Protein backbone atom coordinates (compact mmCIF):
# COMPACT_ATOMS: atom_id res chain seq x y z
CA UNK A 1 0.00 0.00 0.00
CA UNK A 2 1.26 3.44 -0.87
CA UNK A 3 -1.81 5.52 -0.02
CA UNK A 4 -0.64 6.79 3.33
CA UNK A 5 2.65 7.95 1.79
CA UNK A 6 0.89 9.79 -0.94
CA UNK A 7 -0.68 11.62 1.97
CA UNK A 8 2.73 12.25 3.46
CA UNK A 9 3.76 14.06 0.28
CA UNK A 10 0.93 16.56 0.71
CA UNK A 11 3.35 19.16 1.92
CA UNK A 12 1.47 22.44 1.74
CA UNK A 13 -1.73 23.26 3.63
CA UNK A 14 -4.28 25.46 1.92
CA UNK A 15 -5.49 26.80 5.28
CA UNK A 16 -2.19 28.60 5.68
CA UNK A 17 -3.11 30.73 2.68
CA UNK A 18 -6.87 31.04 3.18
CA UNK A 19 -6.97 34.48 4.79
CA UNK A 20 -9.79 36.31 3.05
CA UNK A 21 -7.78 39.52 2.84
CA UNK A 22 -5.80 39.30 -0.40
CA UNK A 23 -2.31 40.76 -0.66
CA UNK A 24 -2.02 44.45 -1.43
CA UNK A 25 -1.95 45.17 -5.15
CA UNK A 26 0.67 47.35 -6.75
CA UNK A 27 -1.62 48.34 -9.62
CA UNK A 28 -2.50 51.78 -8.24
CA UNK A 29 1.10 52.85 -7.79
CA UNK A 30 2.01 51.54 -11.23
CA UNK A 31 -0.88 53.48 -12.75
CA UNK A 32 0.22 56.70 -11.06
CA UNK A 33 3.74 56.26 -12.33
CA UNK A 34 2.48 55.77 -15.88
CA UNK A 35 0.32 58.92 -15.67
CA UNK A 36 3.26 60.99 -14.43
CA UNK A 37 5.45 59.76 -17.30
CA UNK A 38 2.81 60.56 -19.90
CA UNK A 39 2.27 64.09 -18.56
CA UNK A 40 5.99 64.79 -18.59
CA UNK A 41 6.04 63.92 -22.28
CA UNK A 42 3.04 66.19 -23.00
CA UNK A 43 0.82 63.68 -24.78
CA UNK A 44 -2.27 61.70 -23.93
CA UNK A 45 -2.50 57.94 -24.23
CA UNK A 46 -5.65 55.89 -23.99
CA UNK A 47 -5.26 52.63 -22.06
CA UNK A 48 -6.36 49.48 -23.85
CA UNK A 49 -9.83 48.29 -22.89
CA UNK A 50 -9.95 46.28 -19.65
CA UNK A 51 -6.23 45.43 -19.36
CA UNK A 52 -6.79 43.67 -16.05
CA UNK A 53 -9.40 41.44 -17.65
CA UNK A 54 -7.03 40.47 -20.47
CA UNK A 55 -4.22 39.69 -18.03
CA UNK A 56 -6.55 37.66 -15.84
CA UNK A 57 -7.64 35.59 -18.85
CA UNK A 58 -4.02 34.89 -19.71
CA UNK A 59 -3.19 34.01 -16.10
CA UNK A 60 -6.25 31.79 -15.85
CA UNK A 61 -5.10 29.80 -18.86
CA UNK A 62 -1.58 29.50 -17.45
CA UNK A 63 -2.77 28.37 -14.02
CA UNK A 64 -4.63 25.44 -15.55
CA UNK A 65 -1.23 23.81 -15.99
CA UNK A 66 -0.10 24.55 -12.43
CA UNK A 67 -1.06 21.54 -10.30
CA UNK A 68 1.32 21.77 -7.34
CA UNK A 69 -0.38 23.18 -4.23
CA UNK A 70 2.87 24.76 -3.16
CA UNK A 71 3.19 26.61 -6.47
CA UNK A 72 -0.44 27.72 -6.49
CA UNK A 73 -0.18 28.99 -2.93
CA UNK A 74 2.87 31.02 -3.92
CA UNK A 75 0.98 32.46 -6.91
CA UNK A 76 -1.87 33.59 -4.66
CA UNK A 77 0.53 35.74 -2.63
CA UNK A 78 1.89 37.78 -5.55
CA UNK A 79 -0.80 40.49 -5.70
CA UNK A 80 -4.54 41.06 -5.44
CA UNK A 81 -5.40 40.09 -9.03
CA UNK A 82 -3.31 36.90 -8.92
CA UNK A 83 -4.93 36.01 -5.59
CA UNK A 84 -8.36 36.39 -7.20
CA UNK A 85 -7.55 34.43 -10.35
CA UNK A 86 -5.87 31.61 -8.43
CA UNK A 87 -8.98 31.25 -6.27
CA UNK A 88 -11.21 31.16 -9.35
CA UNK A 89 -9.18 28.40 -10.97
CA UNK A 90 -8.50 26.20 -7.93
CA UNK A 91 -10.26 22.88 -8.48
CA UNK A 92 -8.55 20.79 -5.78
CA UNK A 93 -8.24 21.77 -2.12
CA UNK A 94 -6.24 20.00 0.59
CA UNK A 95 -6.92 20.87 4.25
CA UNK A 96 -4.54 19.21 6.68
CA UNK A 97 -6.60 20.01 9.79
CA UNK A 98 -10.38 20.24 9.64
CA UNK A 99 -10.34 22.74 12.54
CA UNK A 100 -7.87 25.14 10.95
CA UNK A 101 -10.67 26.96 9.14
CA UNK A 102 -14.44 26.83 8.76
CA UNK A 103 -16.30 25.46 5.74
CA UNK A 104 -17.68 28.97 5.22
CA UNK A 105 -14.18 30.38 4.72
CA UNK A 106 -13.34 27.68 2.20
CA UNK A 107 -16.49 28.36 0.20
CA UNK A 108 -16.03 32.13 0.29
CA UNK A 109 -12.55 31.86 -1.19
CA UNK A 110 -12.84 29.00 -3.67
CA UNK A 111 -15.89 28.84 -5.93
CA UNK A 112 -15.14 25.95 -8.28
CA UNK A 113 -13.80 23.15 -6.10
CA UNK A 114 -14.23 19.67 -7.54
CA UNK A 115 -11.92 17.73 -5.21
CA UNK A 116 -11.64 17.98 -1.42
CA UNK A 117 -9.00 16.29 0.73
CA UNK A 118 -9.69 16.72 4.44
CA UNK A 119 -7.82 15.44 7.49
CA UNK A 120 -9.12 15.26 11.04
CA UNK A 121 -7.42 13.80 14.08
CA UNK A 122 -3.63 13.95 14.45
CA UNK A 123 -1.61 10.80 13.77
CA UNK A 124 -1.19 9.82 17.43
CA UNK A 125 -4.88 8.91 17.38
CA UNK A 126 -3.76 5.74 15.59
CA UNK A 127 -2.01 4.67 18.81
CA UNK A 128 -5.05 5.13 21.07
CA UNK A 129 -3.60 8.33 22.51
CA UNK A 130 -6.70 10.36 21.70
CA UNK A 131 -10.00 9.81 23.54
CA UNK A 132 -12.97 8.50 21.55
CA UNK A 133 -15.54 11.06 20.45
CA UNK A 134 -12.92 13.82 20.36
CA UNK A 135 -14.36 15.30 17.19
CA UNK A 136 -13.29 15.74 13.55
CA UNK A 137 -16.88 15.57 12.32
CA UNK A 138 -17.45 15.49 8.58
CA UNK A 139 -21.06 16.69 8.98
CA UNK A 140 -20.47 20.48 8.75
CA UNK A 141 -18.24 20.03 5.73
CA UNK A 142 -20.61 17.87 3.71
CA UNK A 143 -23.55 20.14 4.60
CA UNK A 144 -21.72 23.25 3.40
CA UNK A 145 -20.21 21.75 0.26
CA UNK A 146 -23.53 20.18 -0.74
CA UNK A 147 -24.92 23.69 -1.23
CA UNK A 148 -21.81 25.37 -2.61
CA UNK A 149 -20.29 22.69 -4.84
CA UNK A 150 -23.02 20.55 -6.44
CA UNK A 151 -20.44 19.59 -9.07
CA UNK A 152 -18.04 18.07 -6.48
CA UNK A 153 -16.49 14.85 -7.80
CA UNK A 154 -13.95 13.68 -5.24
CA UNK A 155 -13.73 13.45 -1.43
CA UNK A 156 -10.73 11.99 0.40
CA UNK A 157 -11.04 11.87 4.20
CA UNK A 158 -8.49 10.77 6.77
CA UNK A 159 -9.12 10.26 10.50
CA UNK A 160 -12.56 11.87 10.26
CA UNK A 161 -15.81 10.92 12.01
CA UNK A 162 -18.25 10.15 9.21
CA UNK A 163 -21.87 9.11 9.77
CA UNK A 164 -24.24 7.22 7.50
CA UNK A 165 -26.27 10.43 7.22
CA UNK A 166 -23.15 12.23 5.97
CA UNK A 167 -22.68 9.61 3.28
CA UNK A 168 -26.36 9.79 2.33
CA UNK A 169 -26.17 13.58 1.95
CA UNK A 170 -23.01 13.23 -0.11
CA UNK A 171 -24.62 10.67 -2.41
CA UNK A 172 -27.76 12.77 -2.88
CA UNK A 173 -26.07 16.16 -3.33
CA UNK A 174 -23.40 15.50 -5.95
CA UNK A 175 -24.91 13.94 -9.09
CA UNK A 176 -21.54 13.66 -10.81
CA UNK A 177 -19.67 12.27 -7.81
CA UNK A 178 -16.83 9.92 -8.79
CA UNK A 179 -14.36 9.21 -5.98
CA UNK A 180 -14.73 8.46 -2.26
CA UNK A 181 -11.71 7.48 -0.16
CA UNK A 182 -12.02 6.97 3.60
CA UNK A 183 -8.74 6.30 5.43
CA UNK A 184 -8.70 5.59 9.18
CA UNK A 185 -12.24 6.95 9.49
CA UNK A 186 -15.03 5.84 11.83
CA UNK A 187 -18.70 6.41 12.64
CA UNK A 188 -20.28 4.86 9.54
CA UNK A 189 -21.46 1.42 8.56
CA UNK A 190 -22.37 -0.71 5.60
CA UNK A 191 -25.70 1.17 5.37
CA UNK A 192 -23.91 4.37 4.44
CA UNK A 193 -21.68 2.59 1.96
CA UNK A 194 -24.75 1.01 0.37
CA UNK A 195 -26.29 4.45 -0.25
CA UNK A 196 -23.11 5.67 -1.94
CA UNK A 197 -22.92 2.54 -4.08
CA UNK A 198 -26.55 2.87 -5.13
CA UNK A 199 -26.87 6.59 -5.81
CA UNK A 200 -23.44 7.61 -7.14
CA UNK A 201 -23.93 6.21 -10.62
CA UNK A 202 -20.69 7.66 -12.01
CA UNK A 203 -18.60 6.27 -9.14
CA UNK A 204 -15.07 5.36 -10.18
CA UNK A 205 -13.34 4.96 -6.81
CA UNK A 206 -14.68 3.52 -3.54
CA UNK A 207 -11.72 2.90 -1.25
CA UNK A 208 -12.20 2.04 2.44
CA UNK A 209 -8.80 1.70 4.10
CA UNK A 210 -8.02 1.00 7.75
CA UNK A 211 -11.44 2.40 8.69
CA UNK A 212 -13.89 1.08 11.29
CA UNK A 213 -17.00 0.02 9.39
CA UNK A 214 -20.03 -1.09 11.40
CA UNK A 215 -21.72 -4.24 10.17
CA UNK A 216 -25.37 -3.31 9.63
CA UNK A 217 -26.05 -6.77 8.18
CA UNK A 218 -26.77 -5.18 4.83
CA UNK A 219 -25.78 -6.57 1.45
CA UNK A 220 -24.09 -3.39 0.27
CA UNK A 221 -22.31 -5.02 -2.67
CA UNK A 222 -25.70 -5.71 -4.28
CA UNK A 223 -26.60 -2.02 -4.13
CA UNK A 224 -24.48 -0.98 -7.09
CA UNK A 225 -26.69 -0.14 -10.08
CA UNK A 226 -27.32 -2.81 -12.68
CA UNK A 227 -25.51 -2.63 -15.96
CA UNK A 228 -21.97 -1.60 -16.77
CA UNK A 229 -20.28 0.50 -14.05
CA UNK A 230 -17.53 3.12 -14.15
CA UNK A 231 -15.63 1.50 -11.27
CA UNK A 232 -11.85 1.69 -11.51
CA UNK A 233 -10.97 1.02 -7.86
CA UNK A 234 -12.81 -0.89 -5.13
CA UNK A 235 -11.12 -1.49 -1.75
CA UNK A 236 -12.90 -2.93 1.25
CA UNK A 237 -10.23 -4.99 3.01
CA UNK A 238 -11.01 -3.25 6.33
CA UNK A 239 -14.69 -4.29 6.31
CA UNK A 240 -14.97 -6.96 9.01
CA UNK A 241 -18.16 -8.61 7.82
CA UNK A 242 -19.04 -11.22 5.20
CA UNK A 243 -19.99 -10.03 1.73
CA UNK A 244 -22.26 -11.42 -0.95
CA UNK A 245 -19.67 -13.04 -3.17
CA UNK A 246 -22.06 -13.73 -6.03
CA UNK A 247 -22.93 -10.02 -6.14
CA UNK A 248 -19.23 -9.12 -6.00
CA UNK A 249 -18.43 -11.45 -8.87
CA UNK A 250 -21.24 -9.98 -10.96
CA UNK A 251 -20.05 -6.47 -10.11
CA UNK A 252 -16.53 -7.29 -11.25
CA UNK A 253 -17.88 -8.64 -14.53
CA UNK A 254 -19.89 -5.43 -15.03
CA UNK A 255 -16.83 -3.24 -14.35
CA UNK A 256 -14.58 -3.43 -17.43
CA UNK A 257 -12.49 -0.47 -16.25
CA UNK A 258 -11.69 -2.01 -12.86
CA UNK A 259 -7.95 -1.84 -12.20
CA UNK A 260 -7.73 -2.03 -8.41
CA UNK A 261 -9.59 -4.56 -6.24
CA UNK A 262 -8.85 -5.18 -2.57
CA UNK A 263 -11.10 -7.72 -0.91
CA UNK A 264 -11.56 -8.53 2.77
CA UNK A 265 -10.69 -11.65 4.73
CA UNK A 266 -14.09 -13.20 4.02
CA UNK A 267 -13.10 -13.79 0.39
CA UNK A 268 -11.50 -17.22 0.12
CA UNK A 269 -8.73 -18.28 -2.23
CA UNK A 270 -11.20 -20.14 -4.47
CA UNK A 271 -13.33 -17.02 -4.73
CA UNK A 272 -10.26 -14.91 -5.43
CA UNK A 273 -9.45 -17.30 -8.28
CA UNK A 274 -12.88 -16.72 -9.80
CA UNK A 275 -12.48 -12.95 -9.53
CA UNK A 276 -9.09 -13.04 -11.23
CA UNK A 277 -10.46 -15.12 -14.08
CA UNK A 278 -13.23 -12.54 -14.50
CA UNK A 279 -10.89 -9.53 -14.31
CA UNK A 280 -7.50 -10.27 -15.88
CA UNK A 281 -7.04 -6.52 -16.46
CA UNK A 282 -6.38 -5.83 -12.74
CA UNK A 283 -3.18 -3.96 -11.90
CA UNK A 284 -3.61 -3.85 -8.09
CA UNK A 285 -4.97 -6.83 -6.16
CA UNK A 286 -5.74 -7.29 -2.48
CA UNK A 287 -6.08 -11.03 -2.01
CA UNK A 288 -8.34 -11.19 1.03
CA UNK A 289 -7.63 -14.19 3.23
CA UNK A 290 -5.48 -16.13 0.71
CA UNK A 291 -6.71 -19.28 2.38
CA UNK A 292 -8.93 -21.90 0.68
CA UNK A 293 -12.24 -23.18 1.89
CA UNK A 294 -12.46 -26.80 2.91
CA UNK A 295 -12.28 -28.65 -0.39
CA UNK A 296 -14.15 -32.00 -0.41
CA UNK A 297 -11.82 -34.97 -0.59
CA UNK A 298 -11.12 -36.04 -4.15
CA UNK A 299 -12.23 -32.73 -5.65
CA UNK A 300 -9.56 -30.93 -7.62
CA UNK A 301 -8.58 -27.45 -6.51
CA UNK A 302 -8.44 -24.56 -8.97
CA UNK A 303 -5.12 -23.76 -10.62
CA UNK A 304 -4.24 -20.64 -8.65
CA UNK A 305 -0.87 -20.20 -10.33
CA UNK A 306 -2.55 -20.18 -13.75
CA UNK A 307 -4.93 -17.44 -12.61
CA UNK A 308 -2.00 -15.28 -11.56
CA UNK A 309 -0.21 -15.99 -14.83
CA UNK A 310 -3.28 -14.78 -16.71
CA UNK A 311 -3.26 -11.47 -14.82
CA UNK A 312 -0.25 -10.10 -16.64
CA UNK A 313 -0.90 -6.49 -15.59
CA UNK A 314 -0.67 -6.91 -11.80
CA UNK A 315 2.00 -4.62 -10.36
CA UNK A 316 0.67 -4.18 -6.82
CA UNK A 317 -0.15 -7.09 -4.50
CA UNK A 318 -1.47 -6.98 -0.91
CA UNK A 319 -3.81 -8.84 1.46
CA UNK A 320 -2.73 -12.32 2.68
CA UNK A 321 -4.68 -11.84 5.91
CA UNK A 322 -5.13 -15.51 6.79
CA UNK A 323 -2.81 -17.06 4.27
CA UNK A 324 -1.76 -20.69 3.98
CA UNK A 325 2.01 -20.96 3.28
CA UNK A 326 1.66 -23.85 0.83
CA UNK A 327 -0.25 -21.60 -1.59
CA UNK A 328 2.14 -18.66 -1.50
CA UNK A 329 4.20 -19.80 -4.47
CA UNK A 330 1.13 -19.33 -6.67
CA UNK A 331 2.01 -15.65 -6.92
CA UNK A 332 5.49 -16.36 -8.32
CA UNK A 333 4.46 -15.73 -11.91
CA UNK A 334 3.61 -12.06 -11.24
CA UNK A 335 6.61 -11.29 -9.04
CA UNK A 336 8.81 -10.05 -11.87
CA UNK A 337 6.29 -7.32 -12.70
CA UNK A 338 5.55 -6.22 -9.14
CA UNK A 339 6.43 -2.69 -8.06
CA UNK A 340 4.60 -2.96 -4.71
CA UNK A 341 4.28 -5.96 -2.37
CA UNK A 342 2.51 -5.73 0.98
CA UNK A 343 2.90 -8.61 3.45
CA UNK A 344 2.09 -6.48 6.51
CA UNK A 345 -0.79 -8.79 7.54
CA UNK A 346 1.03 -12.06 6.87
CA UNK A 347 3.14 -13.90 9.43
CA UNK A 348 5.74 -14.91 6.85
CA UNK A 349 9.00 -16.58 7.83
CA UNK A 350 12.32 -16.04 6.01
CA UNK A 351 12.16 -19.39 4.22
CA UNK A 352 8.65 -18.53 2.94
CA UNK A 353 9.77 -15.11 1.77
CA UNK A 354 12.97 -16.04 -0.05
CA UNK A 355 11.46 -17.92 -3.05
CA UNK A 356 9.07 -15.02 -3.58
CA UNK A 357 11.34 -12.04 -3.07
CA UNK A 358 14.11 -13.54 -5.20
CA UNK A 359 11.94 -12.83 -8.27
CA UNK A 360 10.93 -9.29 -7.25
CA UNK A 361 13.67 -7.32 -8.98
CA UNK A 362 11.43 -4.34 -9.78
CA UNK A 363 9.92 -3.79 -6.34
CA UNK A 364 9.73 -0.12 -5.32
CA UNK A 365 7.55 -0.55 -2.22
CA UNK A 366 7.78 -3.44 0.26
CA UNK A 367 5.85 -3.76 3.53
CA UNK A 368 6.16 -6.75 5.87
CA UNK A 369 5.98 -7.94 9.47
CA UNK A 370 9.18 -8.42 11.43
CA UNK A 371 8.51 -12.15 11.22
CA UNK A 372 10.71 -12.12 8.10
CA UNK A 373 13.62 -11.49 10.51
CA UNK A 374 17.04 -10.10 9.61
CA UNK A 375 17.49 -13.07 7.29
CA UNK A 376 14.50 -12.02 5.23
CA UNK A 377 15.72 -8.43 5.07
CA UNK A 378 19.05 -9.67 3.78
CA UNK A 379 17.19 -11.48 1.00
CA UNK A 380 15.32 -8.27 0.17
CA UNK A 381 18.61 -6.37 0.07
CA UNK A 382 20.15 -8.93 -2.27
CA UNK A 383 17.35 -8.68 -4.84
CA UNK A 384 15.40 -5.42 -4.60
CA UNK A 385 17.89 -2.90 -5.96
CA UNK A 386 15.12 -0.52 -7.05
CA UNK A 387 13.49 -0.35 -3.60
CA UNK A 388 12.29 3.15 -2.66
CA UNK A 389 10.07 2.49 0.37
CA UNK A 390 10.37 -0.11 3.15
CA UNK A 391 8.08 -0.62 6.14
CA UNK A 392 8.66 -3.27 8.78
CA UNK A 393 5.88 -3.65 11.35
CA UNK A 394 5.94 -5.63 14.63
CA UNK A 395 4.11 -8.95 14.76
CA UNK A 396 4.12 -8.62 18.56
CA UNK A 397 4.05 -4.90 19.51
CA UNK A 398 4.72 -5.43 23.23
CA UNK A 399 7.79 -3.64 24.56
CA UNK A 400 9.17 -6.79 26.21
CA UNK A 401 8.75 -9.06 23.20
CA UNK A 402 11.69 -10.64 21.43
CA UNK A 403 12.84 -8.56 18.50
CA UNK A 404 13.36 -10.62 15.32
CA UNK A 405 14.79 -7.69 13.33
CA UNK A 406 17.70 -5.50 14.39
CA UNK A 407 20.55 -3.35 13.15
CA UNK A 408 21.79 -6.32 11.14
CA UNK A 409 18.75 -6.19 8.88
CA UNK A 410 18.81 -2.40 8.67
CA UNK A 411 22.45 -2.36 7.62
CA UNK A 412 21.83 -5.05 5.01
CA UNK A 413 19.04 -2.94 3.51
CA UNK A 414 21.24 0.15 3.44
CA UNK A 415 23.99 -1.72 1.62
CA UNK A 416 21.73 -3.45 -0.90
CA UNK A 417 18.97 -0.89 -1.51
CA UNK A 418 20.84 2.35 -2.10
CA UNK A 419 17.95 4.08 -3.87
CA UNK A 420 15.86 3.94 -0.70
CA UNK A 421 13.87 7.12 -0.03
CA UNK A 422 11.53 6.17 2.83
CA UNK A 423 11.76 3.73 5.72
CA UNK A 424 9.61 2.83 8.74
CA UNK A 425 11.37 0.27 10.93
CA UNK A 426 10.05 -1.24 14.17
CA UNK A 427 12.61 -3.16 16.22
CA UNK A 428 13.61 -3.99 19.78
CA UNK A 429 17.27 -3.06 19.52
CA UNK A 430 19.51 -1.00 17.26
CA UNK A 431 23.08 0.27 16.96
CA UNK A 432 24.55 3.62 16.03
CA UNK A 433 26.69 1.85 13.46
CA UNK A 434 23.69 0.48 11.56
CA UNK A 435 21.91 3.85 11.54
CA UNK A 436 25.08 5.64 10.45
CA UNK A 437 25.53 3.12 7.63
CA UNK A 438 21.98 3.85 6.51
CA UNK A 439 22.74 7.58 6.38
CA UNK A 440 25.89 7.02 4.32
CA UNK A 441 24.52 4.40 1.93
CA UNK A 442 21.07 5.95 1.37
CA UNK A 443 21.61 9.73 1.17
CA UNK A 444 18.37 10.18 -0.84
CA UNK A 445 16.22 9.41 2.21
CA UNK A 446 13.34 11.83 2.71
CA UNK A 447 11.60 9.79 5.43
CA UNK A 448 13.39 8.01 8.29
CA UNK A 449 11.21 6.57 11.04
CA UNK A 450 12.98 4.28 13.49
CA UNK A 451 10.78 2.94 16.29
CA UNK A 452 12.78 1.14 18.99
CA UNK A 453 9.89 -0.26 20.99
CA UNK A 454 11.56 -0.62 24.38
CA UNK A 455 11.85 2.64 26.29
CA UNK A 456 15.19 4.46 26.52
CA UNK A 457 17.11 1.63 24.85
CA UNK A 458 20.75 2.46 24.09
CA UNK A 459 23.03 1.17 21.36
CA UNK A 460 22.63 -2.60 21.62
CA UNK A 461 26.39 -3.19 21.36
CA UNK A 462 28.09 -0.23 23.07
CA UNK A 463 25.43 0.78 25.57
CA UNK A 464 25.78 4.43 24.51
CA UNK A 465 22.90 6.75 23.57
CA UNK A 466 21.66 6.68 19.98
CA UNK A 467 22.66 10.33 19.47
CA UNK A 468 25.38 9.68 16.89
CA UNK A 469 23.16 7.52 14.70
CA UNK A 470 20.35 10.03 14.43
CA UNK A 471 22.92 12.81 14.12
CA UNK A 472 24.35 11.04 11.08
CA UNK A 473 20.89 10.74 9.54
CA UNK A 474 20.21 14.50 9.67
CA UNK A 475 23.76 15.35 8.58
CA UNK A 476 24.01 13.02 5.59
CA UNK A 477 20.42 12.83 4.34
CA UNK A 478 20.09 16.35 2.97
CA UNK A 479 16.55 15.81 1.62
CA UNK A 480 15.05 14.55 4.90
CA UNK A 481 11.54 15.92 5.52
CA UNK A 482 10.14 13.42 8.04
CA UNK A 483 11.92 11.98 11.07
CA UNK A 484 10.81 9.76 13.95
CA UNK A 485 13.27 9.20 16.79
CA UNK A 486 13.31 6.72 19.68
CA UNK A 487 15.69 4.84 21.94
CA UNK A 488 18.02 6.40 24.51
CA UNK A 489 18.54 9.96 23.26
CA UNK A 490 20.08 12.92 25.05
CA UNK A 491 19.75 16.61 24.24
CA UNK A 492 22.74 16.24 21.94
CA UNK A 493 20.66 14.32 19.40
CA UNK A 494 18.19 17.20 19.26
CA UNK A 495 21.00 19.70 18.82
CA UNK A 496 21.99 17.74 15.69
CA UNK A 497 18.40 17.83 14.47
CA UNK A 498 18.19 21.59 15.01
CA UNK A 499 21.52 22.20 13.31
CA UNK A 500 21.11 19.99 10.25
CA UNK A 501 17.38 19.26 9.86
CA UNK A 502 16.58 22.33 7.82
CA UNK A 503 14.00 20.61 5.59
CA UNK A 504 12.27 18.55 8.29
CA UNK A 505 8.51 19.12 8.23
CA UNK A 506 7.35 16.31 10.55
CA UNK A 507 9.15 15.23 13.73
CA UNK A 508 7.93 12.45 16.03
CA UNK A 509 9.55 11.90 19.43
CA UNK A 510 8.93 9.17 22.02
CA UNK A 511 10.65 8.69 25.39
CA UNK A 512 13.60 10.91 24.50
CA UNK A 513 15.62 13.94 25.60
CA UNK A 514 17.00 15.22 28.90
CA UNK A 515 15.61 18.72 29.26
CA UNK A 516 13.84 21.66 27.66
CA UNK A 517 16.99 22.38 25.68
CA UNK A 518 16.14 19.50 23.37
CA UNK A 519 12.80 21.05 22.44
CA UNK A 520 14.37 24.48 22.03
CA UNK A 521 17.02 23.13 19.65
CA UNK A 522 14.29 21.79 17.38
CA UNK A 523 11.90 24.74 17.52
CA UNK A 524 14.65 27.26 16.90
CA UNK A 525 16.62 25.24 14.39
CA UNK A 526 14.09 23.61 12.02
CA UNK A 527 12.55 26.41 9.92
CA UNK A 528 10.30 24.12 7.84
CA UNK A 529 8.77 22.26 10.80
CA UNK A 530 4.99 21.86 10.41
CA UNK A 531 4.06 18.90 12.60
CA UNK A 532 5.63 18.13 15.97
CA UNK A 533 4.37 15.15 17.96
CA UNK A 534 5.96 14.20 21.28
CA UNK A 535 5.03 11.68 23.95
CA UNK A 536 6.49 10.68 27.31
CA UNK A 537 9.43 13.09 27.24
CA UNK A 538 10.73 15.50 29.94
CA UNK A 539 9.78 18.74 28.18
CA UNK A 540 8.06 21.50 30.14
CA UNK A 541 6.90 25.10 29.94
CA UNK A 542 10.33 26.54 29.14
CA UNK A 543 10.62 24.31 26.10
CA UNK A 544 7.05 25.08 25.09
CA UNK A 545 7.67 28.83 25.23
CA UNK A 546 10.75 28.51 23.02
CA UNK A 547 8.47 27.91 20.05
CA UNK A 548 6.21 30.93 20.45
CA UNK A 549 7.61 32.45 17.26
CA UNK A 550 6.79 29.28 15.29
CA UNK A 551 3.36 28.04 16.34
CA UNK A 552 1.32 30.41 14.15
CA UNK A 553 2.96 28.89 11.07
CA UNK A 554 2.80 25.22 12.12
CA UNK A 555 -0.03 22.82 11.43
CA UNK A 556 0.03 21.37 14.94
CA UNK A 557 2.00 20.53 18.07
CA UNK A 558 1.09 17.47 20.17
CA UNK A 559 2.57 16.85 23.62
CA UNK A 560 1.30 13.99 25.78
CA UNK A 561 2.64 12.73 29.13
CA UNK A 562 5.25 15.48 29.26
CA UNK A 563 5.82 18.17 31.92
CA UNK A 564 3.60 20.93 30.53
CA UNK A 565 1.55 22.91 33.04
CA UNK A 566 -1.88 24.40 32.54
CA UNK A 567 -0.40 27.85 33.14
CA UNK A 568 2.18 27.32 30.43
CA UNK A 569 -0.53 26.32 27.98
CA UNK A 570 -2.61 29.34 28.92
CA UNK A 571 0.36 31.61 28.32
CA UNK A 572 0.70 30.35 24.76
CA UNK A 573 -3.02 30.80 24.16
CA UNK A 574 -3.01 34.41 25.38
CA UNK A 575 0.06 35.35 23.36
CA UNK A 576 -1.07 33.80 20.07
CA UNK A 577 -4.68 34.62 19.14
CA UNK A 578 -4.55 32.59 15.89
CA UNK A 579 -3.50 29.46 17.76
CA UNK A 580 -6.00 27.14 19.47
CA UNK A 581 -4.75 25.37 22.60
CA UNK A 582 -6.66 22.25 23.69
CA UNK A 583 -5.91 20.19 26.78
CA UNK A 584 -7.53 16.90 27.77
CA UNK A 585 -6.97 13.60 29.53
CA UNK A 586 -5.86 10.47 27.73
CA UNK A 587 -9.09 8.57 28.39
CA UNK A 588 -11.59 11.37 27.87
CA UNK A 589 -12.44 11.58 31.57
CA UNK A 590 -14.68 14.57 32.37
CA UNK A 591 -12.94 14.96 35.73
CA UNK A 592 -11.13 18.31 35.68
CA UNK A 593 -8.29 16.80 37.69
CA UNK A 594 -6.95 15.46 34.41
CA UNK A 595 -6.07 19.00 33.35
CA UNK A 596 -5.99 21.12 36.50
CA UNK A 597 -3.16 19.40 38.35
CA UNK A 598 0.49 20.33 37.99
CA UNK A 599 0.69 18.94 34.46
CA UNK A 600 -1.78 18.51 31.64
CA UNK A 601 -2.07 15.01 30.24
CA UNK A 602 -2.29 16.07 26.60
CA UNK A 603 -1.72 19.36 24.80
CA UNK A 604 -2.92 19.74 21.22
CA UNK A 605 -2.03 23.08 19.68
CA UNK A 606 -2.93 24.13 16.14
CA UNK A 607 -3.35 27.26 14.05
CA UNK A 608 -6.86 28.31 13.10
CA UNK A 609 -8.19 31.19 11.02
CA UNK A 610 -11.63 30.95 12.63
CA UNK A 611 -10.85 30.51 16.30
CA UNK A 612 -11.79 27.65 18.64
CA UNK A 613 -14.12 24.95 17.39
CA UNK A 614 -17.74 24.81 18.51
CA UNK A 615 -18.06 21.03 18.86
CA UNK A 616 -15.51 20.34 21.61
CA UNK A 617 -16.71 17.60 24.01
CA UNK A 618 -16.79 18.20 27.76
CA UNK A 619 -13.47 16.50 28.40
CA UNK A 620 -11.67 18.99 26.11
CA UNK A 621 -10.71 22.35 27.61
CA UNK A 622 -9.91 25.10 25.12
CA UNK A 623 -7.74 27.72 26.79
UniProtKB/Swiss-Prot annotation:
Entry's Gene Ontology molecular function annotations: auxin binding; inositol hexakisphosphate binding
Alphabetical UniProt keywords: Auxin signaling pathway, Nucleus, Ubl conjugation pathway
Pfam families: F-box_5, Transp_inhibit
Binding annotation for 1D-myo-inositol hexakisphosphate: 119, 158-159, 391, 447-449, 482, 530-531, 555
Known partners and oligomeric status: Part of a SCF (SKP1-cullin-F-box) protein ligase complex. May interact with auxin and auxin-responsive proteins.
Keyword Nucleus annotated: yes
UniProt feature, compositional bias: Polar residues: 33-45
Gene3D superfamilies for the chain: 1.20.1280.50, Ribonuclease Inhibitor
Protein's recorded name: F-box protein FBX14
GO biological-process terms attached to the record: auxin-activated signaling pathway; protein ubiquitination
Domain F-box residue range list: 54-97
Family matches, as InterPro entries: COI1_F-box, Leu-rich_rpt_Cys-con_subtyp, LRR_dom_sf, Transp_inhibit
Site features described as Interaction with auxin-responsive proteins, chain residue numbers: 210, 426, 535
Renumbered residue ranges of the record's region Disordered: 18-48
Free-text domain note: The F-box is necessary for the interaction with SKP1.
Protein location: Nucleus
Note, other: The myo-inositol hexakisphosphate acts as a structural cofactor.
Main location: nucleus
UniProt superkingdom: Eukaryota
One of the record's GO cellular component terms: SCF ubiquitin ligase complex
Amino acid sequence: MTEEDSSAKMSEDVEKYLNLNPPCSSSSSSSSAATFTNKSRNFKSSPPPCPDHVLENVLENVLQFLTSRCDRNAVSLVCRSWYRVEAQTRLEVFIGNCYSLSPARLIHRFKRVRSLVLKGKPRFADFNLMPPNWGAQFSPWVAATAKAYPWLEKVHLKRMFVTDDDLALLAESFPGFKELTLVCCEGFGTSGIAIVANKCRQLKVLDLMESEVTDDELDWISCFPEGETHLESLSFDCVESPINFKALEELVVRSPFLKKLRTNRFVSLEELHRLMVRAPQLTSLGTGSFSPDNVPQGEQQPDYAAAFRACKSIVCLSGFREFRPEYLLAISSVCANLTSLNFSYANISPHMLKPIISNCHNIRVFWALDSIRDEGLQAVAATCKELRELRIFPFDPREDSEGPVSGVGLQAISEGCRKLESILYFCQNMTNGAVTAMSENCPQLTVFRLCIMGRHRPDHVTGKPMDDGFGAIVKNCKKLTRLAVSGLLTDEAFSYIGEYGKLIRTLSVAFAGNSDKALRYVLEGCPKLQKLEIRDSPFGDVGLRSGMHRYSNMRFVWLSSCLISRGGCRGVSHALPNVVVEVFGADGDDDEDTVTGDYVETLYLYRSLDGPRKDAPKFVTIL
